[in-house]
């Protein structure tokens, strides 16, 4: 079995020799009307993931066709990928359980990070339909797969002491648009004081 899947290394670009050059070719859109454009990093990673999954199905005992593949097989594939993970996930018995920055090494297992699995499933869900699969029978969109990903996220958040909640974006402050009157720039525009009353004149 000669599989070397690496779903949590899309940013590195180490696996494809031309990863660094593809981003520079996208920076000059005026050149490429007739020239073949190299696939984006996402498309290249999606193709690699799809090939890895296809190889997994072929090496399965018994071998599976894509039509036979179910959500249960996807879960089996995701668990299989854990052996290639690089993320330390502390067990409940570990003294560093829940610590985001443990001060010393521990024997806890390495797993695939939740974010890597979530992105992988998204790419494979798209690739399944691009390769002729019907959306209603997409095993990567199965409820069991969604529940598994949610379970992994919650477990890793507790074990690693990190939060996977999305950060709320701050709204732009309205004072910069409205509150210019209090700034020193408008200090010279004060109205002159009213003239003294007529009876006050000598």
Curated annotation (Swiss-Prot):
UniProt feature, compositional bias: Low complexity: 23-36, 173-186
UniProt-listed GO biological process terms: mRNA transcription; post-embryonic plant morphogenesis; response to light stimulus
Chain segments carrying region Disordered: 1-44, 158-202
Entry annotated with the keyword DNA-binding: yes
GO molecular function: DNA binding
Start-end of Gly residues biased regions: 12-22
Location of this chain's protein in the cell: Nucleus
Every ALOG domain range: 41-168
Keywords: Developmental protein, DNA-binding, Nucleus, Transcription, Transcription regulation
Pro residues bias spans: 192-202
Motif mapping: Nuclear localization signal: 166-170
GO cellular component: nucleus
Family label: Belongs to the plant homeotic and developmental regulators ALOG protein family.
General function of this protein: Probable transcription regulator that acts as a developmental regulator by promoting cell growth in response to light.
PANTHER family assigned: PROTEIN G1-LIKE2 (PTHR31165), PROTEIN G1-LIKE3 (PTHR31165:SF43)
Protein name according to UniProt: Protein G1-like4
Organism, scientific name: Oryza sativa subsp. indica (Rice)
């Amino acid at each position: 079995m000669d599989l070397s899947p690496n779903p949590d290394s899309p940013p590195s670009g180490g696996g494809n020799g031309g990863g660094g050059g593809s981003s520079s070719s996208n920076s000059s859109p005026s050149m490429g009307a007739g020239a073949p454009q190299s696939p984006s990093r996402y498309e290249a990673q999606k193709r690699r993931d799809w090939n890895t999954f296809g190889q997994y199905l072929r090496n399965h005992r018994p071998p599976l066709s894509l039509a036979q593949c179910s959500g249960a097989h996807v879960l089996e594939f995701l668990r299989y990928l854990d052996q290639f993970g690089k993320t330390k996930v502390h067990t409940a018995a570990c003294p560093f359980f829940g610590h985001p920055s443990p001060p010393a090494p521990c024997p806890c297992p390495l797993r695939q990070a939740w974010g890597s699995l979530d992105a992988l499933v998204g790419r494979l869900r798209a690739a399944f339909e691009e390769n002729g699969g019907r959306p209603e029978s997409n095993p990567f969109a199965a409820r069991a797969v969604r529940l598994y990903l949610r379970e992994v996220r919650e477990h890793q958040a507790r074990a690693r002491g990190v939060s996977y909640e999305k950060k709320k974006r701050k709204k732009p402050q309205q004072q910069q648009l409205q509150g210019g009157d209090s700034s020193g720039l408008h200090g010279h525009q004060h109205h002159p004081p009213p003239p003294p009353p007529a009876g006050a004149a000598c």
